[in-house]
């Protein structure tokens, strides 16, 4: 006797299954019951020319809009001097996603969830691959810097170091954001390097 088998051909969405599933998603706050109440929010500033996503260095201003409770305006930080925290995807409701731009993006006026410096939140951020390799197995208090143009953690050279601890590094197996300024689309790079920073 024989049993005929005709299994269905199955496919998986790209990046959903792999032999190595140890990785992070840029800008997705690592759950911590003591820190989650530090999550804050504010509208994306009207002067911002780029959409916002998680894992971006931000600058927060005081609320002078007359709308009590919305929080201060959030913009991209341009230097250490105006860096106040990092944006996250956690509780980023109603951010825009399309098939061409699968990364959730926020436009002007939409609420940006973020953690302030000093909150002790652990946030995976995009990291230069060479830096990630040098940080692996190192002390958590190594000095690092931030590339405010490309929104990526880079090696410290001179000036003020980023006031963070690097508590983990994942090389080549994490999802990081790739933004195309020409099309305005943001896609996931599934082979990115990430550093988990405690801010």
Where are the predicted features?
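Surface-exposed, low-hydrophobicity beta-strand/loop segments enriched in small/polar/acidic residues
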Residues: 1-199
């Amino acid at each position: 006797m024989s049993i005929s088998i005709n299994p269905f051909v199955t496919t998986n969405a790209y990046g959903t299954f792999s032999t190595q599933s140890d990785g992070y998603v840029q800008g997705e706050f690592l759950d911590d019951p003591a820190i989650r109440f530090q999550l804050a929010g504010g509208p994306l500033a009207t002067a911002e020319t780029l959409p916002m996503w998680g894992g971006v260095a931000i600058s927060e201003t005081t609320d002078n809009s007359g709308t009590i409770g919305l929080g201060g305006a959030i913009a991209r930080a341009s230097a250490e001097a105006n860096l106040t925290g990092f944006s996250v995807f956690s509780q980023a409701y109603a951010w825009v996603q399309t098939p061409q731009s699968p990364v959730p993006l926020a436009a002007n006026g939409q609420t940006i969830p973020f953690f302030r410096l000093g909150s002790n939140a652990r946030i995976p951020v995009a990291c230069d691959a060479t830096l990630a390799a040098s940080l692996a197995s190192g002390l958590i208090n190594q000095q690092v810097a931030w590339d405010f143009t490309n929104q990526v953690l880079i090696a410290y050279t001179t000036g003020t170091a980023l006031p963070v601890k690097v508590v983990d590094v994942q090389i080549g197996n994490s999802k990081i954001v790739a933004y195309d300024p020409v099309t305005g689309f943001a896609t996931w790079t599934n082979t990115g390097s990430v550093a988990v920073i405690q801010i």
